[in-house]
Amino acid sequence: MYNSIYGSPFPKINPKVRYKTALERAGFDTKPRNPFSSQRNASTGSLQASVKSPPITRQRNVSAAPSVPVTMKSAYTASSKSAYSSVKGESDIYPPPVLENSERRSVTPPKNSNFTSSRPSDISRSISRPSERASQEDPFRFERDLDRQAEQYAASRHTCKSPANKEFQAADNFPFNFEQEDAGNTEREQDLSPIERSFMMLTQNDTASVVNSMNQTDNRGVLDQKLGKEQQKEESSIEYESEGQQEDENDIESLNFEPDPKLQMNLENEPLQDDFPEAKQEEKNTEPKIPEINVTRESNTPSLTMNALDSKIYPDDNFSGLESSKEQKSPGVSSSSTKVEDLSLDGLNEKRLSITSSENVETPYTATNLQVEQLIAQLDDVSLSRNAKLDMNGNCLNAVDRKASRFKKSSAYLSGYPSMDIPVTQQTSIVQNSNTNLSRQTILVDKGDVDEDAPSESTTNGGTPIFYKFKQSNVEYSNNEGMGSQETFRTKLPTIEALQLQHKRNITDLREEIDNSKSNDSHVLPNGGTTRYSSDADYKETEPIEFKYPPGEGPCRACGLEVTGKRMFSKKENELSGQWHRECFKCIECGIKFNKHVPCYILGDEPYCQKHYHEENHSICKVCSNFIEGECLENDKVERFHVDCLNCFLCKTAITNDYYIFNGEIPLCGNHDMEALLKEGIDNATSSNDKNNTLSKRRTRLINFN
């Protein structure tokens, strides 16, 4: 029981059995190998001689590619097969078939090397030992040999041009003697697909540095063949270019730069050169004779003539002609437009109308446009007659100038009420077929209000009607004569809201004069701002809401300048908004500067001294005339007292509830006989004074100013 509970849960280890280690269980190969076998360096990827190195356990290299043994065919053809079979049986790695062409070159080993062994380790050892001895004697020997062979190869390029001779000479100059390949092998290597060739290059680069150098020397012949072919192509292209240059020179010499009369006849534009003066003359002759524009829709599409082409081709010569044509065309357009509307014009009106029509009128008037203009004119006539009925004070009708086009776009004139903000300009009228409307409009016009330079007859600006605007007359009426007309004018005015009065101040001023004549209850604020009327007035204008900056922000509230340096502001958000310069922080009533001895009182977001604060706040005691701060008593007449100051005159008790005022000045509590006091009086006066005694009741409440 003891061992089964507290013992080891694992079975006991058998000493006769060899258990796998952690590396073996993980899959690593921990078996010892031949110490003379080639090992791959993980950092450089090159083969190093392992003769003098101690036996190392072989591990799997994940990053490096599997090494492929190099088979030598020429010197040991029989042993290469056995080596291949041994490699196949030992590591189960088959060399790729692509490497057959690249590995057929054999190396003639030095005399000291031994190729009797069939293991690939002996091959790598025989290859690496001469390179080690050569690198120990002279480390730069291989590079100097390559430079010398490159020079010899460059010198022999001109002498022997056949690829076979080049390959033979390059192979003799290399430090390693390689066997020559067959013609079939070279053709087979050249016929490789790009994918197989890239795979061959990758596998060659992945092998050891010595084998890589051997492969580079093997590929030297192929490179020489390619270079020879490229050189032949370059020489042929140079010869072709030289022949082409000679042909170009011959072509240039054969060119004839003399003028050809046939070519000139084909290229010149005879209508432009011959007809241009005539076309210009015809344009000058025909422009003043433009007929009147017909009211049709077909005339809207302009036609492209030869004159327009001439103006585009010759802009400098035809510029003056264009100006003259503009000046000559504009009267024609104006005359046609006025003829459609049957208007009679002066010379001055004709001149103004031509300018406006040339600027504003782009298309001629159609029949539908004419009907719309007549309808607008009738509506304007109705509005003018309505305004004439409202004009009971002798206000004259005035029109807006043609240049003030922004007023013509609006339909505010249809409302029938005058707009006083528009300046008074020239006097015009709309000519209608009916003479009654014309007479009714011209009767109300005052000659003193019409400008002298205004046109005598009515005109239209491009067919649109001119709208009448009103000017407020400055005629003052007496109390007897003017009140009747003002009363009638007042009854006809509708009720206008306060938002409308902000945009129509002249109507407000007129209403103010009427109210001032009747009552003097209205008053003006001290700052000269908005006017307030009495409670029975029909119009009241509210004060505009001023923007308030947070405490410590915005310009100085006293001078309006930016606050730099020392500033004064309230640390509480609900006390004072904005900020001041230190020297500008004063009482708004007396101008005394605030400091440690002069406190600041805040009332209505304004700073006051103590005296003016209590005057504005009505917090001065009526008994002692001192300032009230804290609790106080207030009666129904908004009179305030200190709690200790309001006492009964007779018994000297403090009054906290309702009390009485005897003869308008003496406070009395409710504990006394009021009827006896009315008859006898307080000082026991004679009965003759009984009729003069008065008594009134006051109600009080307790308030706190804190």
From Swiss-Prot:
Residues 556-612, 621-672 form the LIM zinc-binding domain. The modification Phosphoserine is found at residues 43, 63. GO terms for molecular function: metal ion binding; Rho GDP-dissociation inhibitor activity. Residues 237-252 have a biased composition (Acidic residues). It holds the Pfam family LIM. Residues 130-150, 222-236, 279-290 have a biased composition (Basic and acidic residues). One of its GO terms (cellular component) is mating projection tip. It comes from the Eukaryota. One of its GO terms (biological process) is regulation of Rho protein signal transduction. Keywords: LIM domain, Metal-binding, Phosphoprotein, Repeat, Zinc. PROSITE patterns: LIM_DOMAIN_1, LIM_DOMAIN_2. The keyword Manganese does not apply. Residues 24-192, 222-258, 279-341, 514-537 are annotated as: Disordered. Residues 73-86, 117-129 have a biased composition (Low complexity). Residues 35-64, 296-308 have a biased composition (Polar residues). Present with 1310 molecules/cell in log phase SD medium. This is Paxillin-like protein 1. It comes from Saccharomyces cerevisiae (strain ATCC 204508 / S288c).
